[in-house]
Amino acid sequence: MEGLLAGGLAAPDHPRGPAPREDIESGAEAAEGEGDIFPSSHYLPITKEGPRDILDGRSGISDGQPHPGLSEALPRATSATHRISSCYWDGDSLDFQPGSPPPHLLGPFPASLDVQGSWEHPMVQEAREGTPSEQRFKDSVIVRTMKPYAKLKGSRKFLHHQGEVKFLEKYSPSHHKFDWLQDTDEQGPLKDTGLHLDLPAQPPTVTSFRRVIVPVDNTPKTLDMEVMGTREDLEDFGQVAQPSEWGLHTSASEVATQTWTVNSEASVERLQPLLSPVQTGPYLCELLQEVAGGVDSNEEEEEEPAVFPCIECSIYFKHKEHLLEHMSQHRRAPGQEPPADLAPLACSECGWAFTEPTALEQHWQLHQASREKIIEEIQKLKQFPGDEGREARLQCSKCVFGTNSSRAFMQHAKLHVRGSLPSRQATEPFRGGSPVLDVSTLVYPSYGDSSGLNTCVHCGFTAPSKSLLREHTRLVHAHHAHWEEVGEAFEDLTSQPCTSQDAYTHSPDTATVDYFSKSEPLLASVWQENPSGYDPDLAFGPDYQQPGMRNFPLLNSGQQSLGKLAFPSPMASASYSIQRNRNKSTVHLQRMEDKSHLWSEEEEEEDEDVVLTSERDFTPENGAFPPLAIPSLIPQPALELKQTFQDALQAVDASETQQQQLQGMVPIVLMAKLRPQVIAATTRASPQLPPEEPELRSTHPLDFLLLDAPLGGSLGLNTLLEGDPAMALKHEERKCPYCPDRFHYGIGLANHVRGHLNRVGVSYNVRHFISAEEVKAIERRFSFQKKKKKVANFDPGTFSLMRCDFCGAGFDTRAGLSSHARAHLRDFGITNWELTISPINILQELLATSAAELPPSPLGREPGGPPRSFLTSRRPRLPLTMPFPPTWAEDPGPIYGDAQSLTTCEVCGACFETRKGLSSHARSHLRQLGVAESESSGAPIDLLYELVKQKGLPDAPLGLTPSLTKKSNSPKEFLAGAARPGLLTLAKPMDAPAVNKAIKSPPGFSAKGLTHPSSSPLLKKAPLTLAGSPTPKNPEDKSPQLSLSPRPTSPKAQWPQSEDEGPLNLTSGPEPTRDIRCEFCGEFFENRKGLSSHARSHLRQMGVTEWYVNGSPIDTLREILKRRTQSRPGGHLHPPGPSPKALAKVLSTGGPGSSLEARSPSDLHISPLTKKLPPPPGSPLGHSPTASPPPTARKMFSGLATPSLPKKLKPEHMRVEIKREMLPGTLHGEPHPSEGPWGTPREDMAPLNLSARAEPVRDIRCEFCGEFFENRKGLSSHARSHLRQMGVTEWSVNGSPIDTLREILKKKSKLCLIKKEPPAGDLAPALTEDGSPTAAPGALHSPLPLSPLASRPGKPGAGPTQVPRELSLSPITGSKPSAASYLGPVATKRPLQEDRFLPAEVKAKTYIQTELPFKAKTLHEKTSHSSTEACCELCGLYFENRKALASHARAHLRQFGVTEWCVNGSPIETLSEWIKHRPQKVGAYRSYIQGGRPFTKKFRSAGHGRDSDKRPPLGLAPGGLSLVGRSAGGEPGLEAGRAADSGERPLATSPPGTVKSEEHQRQNINKFERRQARPSDASAARGGEEVNDLQQKLEEVRQPPPRVRPVPSLVPRPPQTSLVKFVGNIYTLKCRFCEVEFQGPLSIQEEWVRHLQRHILEMNFSKADPPPEEPQAPQAQTAAVEAP
């Protein structure tokens, strides 16, 4: 060892700055070149894998097993730590002066470092300790391995031992390790093939040795003979040293040294002959070379990549086994998968086999690129705090990012800088632009040459010139100010000296620019070119240019910096440039840190991640040093090391040669733990390298790449986000913490995470406060169905790919395919279909029925084939031409088997993802089959199947798929079978004469259709016909095949004329686009969505707020209509409707067309009377189903006029009650038996909302002037004009100008007949007809006791509107179907203008009301108030406007327990009615508020009193309604009419009998509801005049007595306890006047309000405003009693 050590100085083996300790602990050491003899040697890190030298036999660098001592010397045998240091020097002498200041080194030292005293030469320390250096290295094996072009040939990983935590601060400067080597190497000219540098031949090596001296203590020691000896040695070498030249050994006898730092006392070295003569280029950061090239290591087996991305999709996994499992989904086709014996190469990550290394390498690069993307995005996601918005203090000038954290802002700014720096760095560092770097371009003036010192005031850096100092200041110290200027740091690197750290920074920035953006390190690629082993002989022959070098973009284009070549890894956050001073022939390692990126504070604090030790040449004498990079980029220990080393050199009395050697050999050592997977990856890569690596275009600063994660820590998400260098090398996808999804980009992950958090109601900014487990648990609980669906839709066979049967387009999700199918259907003109049927299935059926020349057989069987068992899957056959087999669950059953059958409708073959969907679908079938109570009779699926089994499938009756239709050859069988007790009997269409049967028959069951169940080819087809296809004229064909949604449409439209025509009627109605018609008012809609919204409006008007039937407002409205219709079986026995047969025919054949959603009359359940009545020739019902468009609600109801009729059926005649509960026989409170099936208006039943009337499409007529309008919107605008003329500016009734006008007309004109509507005579006949069995079918006015509807004459289709209210459709005017007066067909659209009056009557009243708008009771008062005054009728307070009065009235009503404004939705009117019906309470209240003084209404008390005298004050409830209800009892009706005439509003204007019966039947129902029975009921028995009178009376009754403005007083005290309570969806409503409680869903309030209304109405009887009122009320009551 003496001889060895005598040759030169050995650097102390203690760690240098922070690096030394890491070097020692990691077992890595940087080898340095030795003296002039071995100037260009590159010392490669050695990874110790057990007893094996990883370089041995793999990289071609080491030629044998490491010395046995190495295995013991290494701290851990399983870890490999690499430390690379480069040795180069210039010829200048290096003089170290003790205590020389650090400024001329790498910058200031952090105060936190424990720097004790100046560093002394190792020999001095050694001497002081009394331990000769030779003794220290007795057991050392000195190994110097030279790896030329390592920088170009692959990357090595620098791995710190797992679990080792490097605290660099704890090492004192005395522990810095320096290796000073002198070596004489091969002779002959050396050629740098990498950089094409021709270097002079090196003199023969005098000695080959390395001396490593490790200072043990911090105690200063004087130099001893060891030092002198070393100096002598150095001097000896000085003779042969050629520091300006770099050369590689060219003979195998040359010696390379591998240095292993074993501990703080010594280093293990081994001398080895070089394997082959190789030439090396200028020094390039070997650290990055190692990273890029990778060191073949077995540790990859021990430490797998933390992220395993799938290259087929954007998913990555934490564990390899998961990726392998996942990759099974991407399994290549059998033909693509090479045989195992022929594919020896397999991807270690995903297991794919390859026959060629090139293919494997390319495949691996995909993995790497994926990892890089993941890392990049995770860096972005984690590194930068969330955007705090524009309110933040710091705002980014380039984007909308804002934050209050300066650190976060700086980090964010780096993002912009990263994007901008690469281009500059790529183009400017080497402007020569030549593909091959010329040394001349890298020549920098020697520091020693610089004349004049310019010292940086910030860091003490001395620049050779002011310009360089300015540049230094701008680059190094201006990073906080302007990130954008950072790029300029690299503008002219060739013109300015740089520190070694600067050199590090420059090239690597460009080299590693895109490390995170899917780039494979260039060097790594080169190294990977020969995965079997790196052979320097092959790669670097004397004249051989390294393979792949020509492919490096850097070398090929001047746009790339040299560093790019050498530093593909994140470690290369420093760029390296080579300077050759032609005068001094020096090559300077320059490291220029990326000025744009500072180490974060944590990075500075935690030097454990990366140790940066700067190595550069410097001349203390002249103080010329390259510009400093950002000080924060260099760990303080490194800077301190430089200073101490400088001091030591100055103290050492070394020869000039030694000084020079030492001067050029202070290395920058980057210590970082790199995962072995990267090394393994590089070695696995195939030799082929893509011609260009375009990804390596952006710069990643050192601070960005070398973040502060513990090197030994696991590579978790935090590590990834914090930028662990090891992580930086991994192309990791980011995993969502809440689910297995992985993302390449941080933005995608962030958005995904936001989705998770939003679903659980957590803000993204506070996501750290809720654990991932909590989020997962919440999502599992509340989003299970969604996730389940998503999983269910995943088709592993096609990797979640679903294909369109029509065009073969693939989709990842069923939702996407469904949307796509809708587009196809729209192309086919099919825009409507049953909501419960999937568009995918519809398209499938459509294709199945139209694909083959022969119409496809129904889903159930082949055409003509034997019927299959009902339960067999009857999916439509896919067309033979279908490009791809269906992949979704709705595909033909065979594909999915029994499991699918569980969610497949056996009737029509429609598939559903859940049983819930199938259940809803089954209900639609049951409804179509006329099973009205299916929703409450248990499982609809089982019920449907049972029904079908028992009865067989109807002939394409319900829009069911042909399978169902075929199933039952005769509808009779289908209908005959007894359904469940709860089920409505399905009448045979054949029995149309039997009205009940006809009505009950499903819409699709026309008599003919039933008769020809399966004979019709259409039936065989998928029953859905294309919207555009002509409808068959045959009633048979009319059965809606797939019109699952009962939309009234023309029967023709429903059925294709021929099988070839529309195969499937996808729309519920015959005309999917237009024939979706409201059953209540007959209005057409483009699709079910519009109809649904429209139905909701009807229901709301009726007071129904919950869609209890299948959750569908359409079905609910239909059900209400049906139940109302059914509930009046005892109505007029001979309503003037079409003959039962005709009616049945219309209803049954109309099928879907007849109802809102192709509902049959049976669904509507029109009262049998109506059904039985022969339809008048012109009656809509009389129209043959085929001749006329499918019956709409108008057709079905007398109130609805058929399209053929010039006027729609009088809506007035139809009365709909929403409340099932209210009606005895129906779910919604069907009319009491006592009520006439048609004639008895059910005011109680009528929803309080007067505006509930349906809105006819064309027959919307103004009640005031009789003008028709296309829609309610036009009428509303028109009504506003009337109201403005009247001085009314607020629509007090339901906020609707139409209702307000109607109410005003009603209240003001007791003689509503003034209207231009059909003469009273016409109306009377209509009413009479209604009441009489001979009532015209068109006048099927259900005695909608929808006084509110009636009150809204402005709304066309008043009848229909009323129908929704009462939903019991009874023909009010039967004798005159279409001629019956305005209420005739036109009336269809118009609800009864007055609550219970026919439109004409109402209109007449309206006119009168118009004249007396302000005197009208509530509305009138409102109107009058709005125009003249707003005074509270109860307390006499005056208000500025009606709005204030309404608010005041609401307070009164709430005090009295009334929470629903049942009268026209107006609290003012409701209060007025309440006052009339509760005179005693009113009196008591007035007395109370006035202190016992009599209450007097100054203004209208008299007028109102008179009015009230004339009419029963809301006695309508019993009396008024009874009057109206009494179709025969003229007097009651007349009285009601008179009441209306008297100006009082007939609240319960429905036919007296009806009203009374309803009242009696349902005490809960408010009798003064707007839906007063149409006078039509009463008028049915009388002449038009009587009807008019009756209507007038009713109006009078409804109109509250003139309001007497009470003396202003305080609002009365509210009830002691709340009347309304609700828990969840269950409401408990108490009656303010009695002990009755109502419990149920929100819709229960309808009953409650009616009940309250009844009380309110009753109050009027006891004490009406004037006494005459009371007598009227009793009369009305009597009439009502008689009416039944």
From Swiss-Prot:
Residues 1063-1067 are annotated as: Interaction with CTBP1 and CTBP2 1. A zinc finger (C2H2-type) spans 308-330, 345-367, 454-477, 734-756, 802-824, 903-925, 1076-1098, 1260-1282, 1430-1452, 1629-1655. Residues 1599-1611 have a biased composition (Pro residues). GO terms for molecular function: histone methyltransferase binding; protein-containing complex binding; SET domain binding; zinc ion binding. PROSITE patterns: ZINC_FINGER_C2H2_1, ZINC_FINGER_C2H2_2. Gene3D superfamilies: Classic Zinc Finger. GO terms for cellular component: nucleus. It holds the Pfam family zf-WIZ. It comes from the Eukaryota. Disulfide bonds: none annotated. Its main location: nucleus. Residues 13-24, 1556-1574 have a biased composition (Basic and acidic residues). There is a cross-link at residues 916, 972, 988, 1000, 1021, 1033, 1038, 1089, 1141, 1145, 1171-1172, 1210, 1273, 1315, 1376, 1389, 1403, 1405, 1415, 1481, 1497, 1510, 1556, 1567, 1593, 1663 (Glycyl lysine isopeptide (Lys-Gly) (interchain with G-Cter in SUMO2)). The modification Phosphoserine is found at residues 1029, 1039, 1045, 1050, 1058, 1112, 1139, 1155, 1160, 1167, 1179, 1184, 1296, 1342, 1347, 1550. SMART domains: ZnF_C2H2 (SM00355). The keyword Metal-binding applies. According to PubMed:9795207, isoform L and isoform S are brain-specific. According to PubMed:16702210, isoform S is ubiquitously expressed. There is a cross-link at residue 1556 (Glycyl lysine isopeptide (Lys-Gly) (interchain with G-Cter in SUMO1)). Residues 1-77, 854-876, 1005-1072, 1127-1208, 1320-1384, 1496-1587, 1592-1611, 1662-1684 are annotated as: Disordered. The modification N6,N6-dimethyllysine is found at residue 1195. Part of a complex containing at least CDYL, REST, WIZ, SETB1, EHMT1 and EHMT2. Interacts with EHMT1, EHMT2, CTBP1 and CTBP2. The C2H2-type zinc finger 10 mediates interaction with EHMT1 and EHMT2. This is Protein Wiz.
